[in-house]
Amino acid sequence: ECENTECPRACPGEYEFDEDGCNTCVCKGCDDAQCRCSSDANGCESFCTCNTRCSAADECNPRCTCK
C-alpha cells in the first residue's frame, strides 16, 4: 500500500514510481544533482529546480534543504 507522497515545494509534479508502483519524489535535496537551489540574502533557499545539475557553489548552499 502506497503512502500519500507529497513532493517538496517548488517541485510539483516531479514524481517517479518505485519498484512497488508507488510514487516517490525525484527532487531530493541540495546535495542531489537533481535539485538546484537559489539562495536569498540570508543564505537560505528561495526556490529549487528539479532535474538540473548544480553549476555554481552558491547555488548549492549546504544550509539549503530544498524541502
UniProtKB/Swiss-Prot annotation:
Keywords noted in UniProt: Disulfide bond, Protease inhibitor, Secreted, Serine protease inhibitor
Stated name of the protein: Theromin
Organism from which the protein derives: Theromyzon tessulatum
Database matches in InterPro entries: Antistasin-like
Residues in the signal sequence: none
Entry annotated with the keyword S-adenosyl-L-methionine: no
Record GO terms (molecular function): serine-type endopeptidase inhibitor activity
GO CC annotation: extracellular region
Site (Reactive bond): 36-37
Subcellular localization: Secreted
Assembly information from the UniProt record: Homodimer.
Domain Antistasin-like: 2-27
Family as reported in the entry's similarity comment: Belongs to the protease inhibitor I15 (antistasin) family.
Functional note: Potent thrombin-specific inhibitor.
